[in-house]
Amino acid sequence: MEKTQKMNKMGTEKISRLLLTMGVPMIISMVVQAVYNIVDSYFVSCMKDPNIPALGDYAVNALTLAFPVQMLMVAVGVGTGVGINSILSRSLGEGNKEKCSKISGNSIFLALCTCVVFVLFGIFGVDAYIASQTSDPIITSMAVSYLKICTYSSLGVSMYMIFEKLLQATGYTMQTTVAQIVGAVVNMILDPIMIFGWCGCPKLGIDGAAIATVIGQFISFFIDAYFYFRCNSKHFNTSLKYMKPEGRIIRQIYQVGIPAIIMQALMSILTYSINVIFVRVSTDAVTAYGIYYKIQQFVFFAAFGMNNAMIPIIAFNYGKQDKKRVNDSIKYGLIYTVSILCAGIIILQLFAKQILGIFSLTESTTELAMLAIRIITPGFIFVGANIAYQGIFQALGNGVHSLILSLVRLIVVPLPLAYIFSCFDFASSIIWIAFPIGEAVAFIVALVFMANIRRKKINPIKNSV
């Protein structure tokens, strides 16, 4: 009975409550993920050396340059996970346990392949990548060292994200939250110890930040793996014999997964391109953008958490052909996600100065980061809707629509505008406007896509089962 109730809650529980019970743990999980990205920045901003003025700013700059590759690692894991989540949830709704086992086993195989790719990039590509963004020897040295440690140890991040999605698809969101929190706490504890050489540990500087991050990721991986074999085995066979690659399953995963990977990777492309564009303005602008971006992630990742809860619920009920529950999931998913972003607008507008005061930055960098927050955050209301629509499209198998939406909001509109604005003498004051304009245009595109998908996929569904 317990097993049946667990399997059916996505098809029976009231949607408004179900989204919260599944979404809140995922929101916590995603916010904890944002902690990984900001804790390192905080501690390295406190690094000091009498021979290197503003060493903290140099270190934050180095992390900003390395960050797009870290985002790409996450993009591949999350994008693959979205494909897994979508087809696994639909297969659960259809009651196809054998297919669920194959999806899960092939997912683990794909995570191992991802790790190999990033290790090879760490060996052969990191130096050239960093050199394409800066010629400063101090920043280059720190960025290369940090990024090589992260790529060589990419097994942790690749595996924990796949196991996380496998658990989320079956409704075990609290377990993934536990794994995220424990990993983040370990990271936060180890960061100052390794960076500054506390408790008898050698003073490792920025390398210590990388090592602490990697250890935290491996801890999350081990916990998620434990819960996966313990919990998901109640619903389908979790034997590793299903790791044998099966082309049909992998194709189905990546029909949704590849657009999602590209969609997530666009954030890496955006950040890398913005770094290159902002160098034309000033080094302070690059550092300010890096700090703003990581602060912004606390709000965006909370919305992604709700999005992650919405995707399996919509997919499950679409698999069951339950029209009412699909529509309710879309409605409440939009309401909750936009509400999260509206709360983010209020918090960042009211407390920008206090939040930026956490970091040991120069006055000029702090002023630029403050300006970025003031200008960009009003556009968050469009961000909330766009994130929700991306999840809706993915859940219904329209990954290409999500990809196009991401292209518009992250590349097609903001990058050309940012480049144009960077050509003006007062570039540092106006370049930030490119981001909310991109979100507003993408919102219009999303409305058009949603109307088309509703007509073709949702409206033809017969009355609720």
Where are the regions that the model predicts?
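Transmembrane alpha-helix boundary and packing residues in multipass membrane permease domains
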Residues: 26, 30, 42, 86, ...
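Transmembrane helix-bundle signature of multi-pass secondary active exporters and lipid flippases
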Residues: 27-82, 86, 150-157, 217, ...
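Helix-loop interface residues and adjacent transmembrane-helix termini in multi-pass membrane transporters
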Residues: 35-38, 46-47, 57, 91-94, ...
